[in-house]
């Protein structure tokens, strides 16, 4: 009789331990984690506003802009009245700019930077590109981001987001 009670408690304990281990395994495997980008590798930036591109690019291009003179050759200021109407001022003593420019298009185009990540010897610029219906006019989609000058010597690689 004593052995039979001990046996049933022992079996019950094994079942509970197995159930606990299985539950812990399932809970740990259900969590989704984005470990691809380490927090220390993210490069902060500010998106520059109220500029227009001067020129006609025939293919997508990334331009690194390191001086006010280069900025003035590539972009004009598009100020307007009201809040937020001034073009973003860029201090080229502390920062540089990265411009991503697409060719002219008559399709509705939304282009926006998503992230800038430091990899071993380059910066990865991830962006979102959505194109819609044809319009009756042409635009030249682009964005400009302002980055700390300590990253100026890194090459830049663009990565389109497929969200």
What kind of feature is each model-predicted range?
Residues 30-163:
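Exposed, flexible binding/inhibitory loops of compact, secreted disulfide-stabilized domains
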């Amino acid at each position: 009789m004593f052995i039979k009670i001990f046996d049933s408690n022992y079996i019950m304990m094994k079942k509970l331990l197995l159930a606990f281990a299985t539950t812990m395994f399932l809970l740990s495997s259900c969590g989704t984690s984005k470990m691809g980008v380490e927090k220390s590798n993210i490069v902060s930036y500010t998106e520059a506003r109220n500029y227009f591109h001067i020129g006609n690019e025939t293919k997508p291009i990334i331009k690194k802009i390191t001086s006010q003179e280069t900025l003035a050759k590539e972009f004009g200021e598009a100020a307007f009245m009201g809040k937020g109407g001034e073009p973003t001022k860029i201090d080229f003593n502390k920062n540089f700019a990265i411009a991503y420019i697409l060719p002219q298009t008559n399709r509705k185009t939304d282009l926006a930077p998503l992230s800038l990540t430091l990899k071993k010897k380059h910066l990865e610029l991830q962006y979102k590109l959505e194109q819609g219906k044809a319009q009756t006019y042409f635009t030249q989609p682009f964005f400009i981001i302002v980055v700390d000058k300590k990253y100026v010597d890194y090459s830049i690689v663009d990565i389109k987001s497929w969200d």
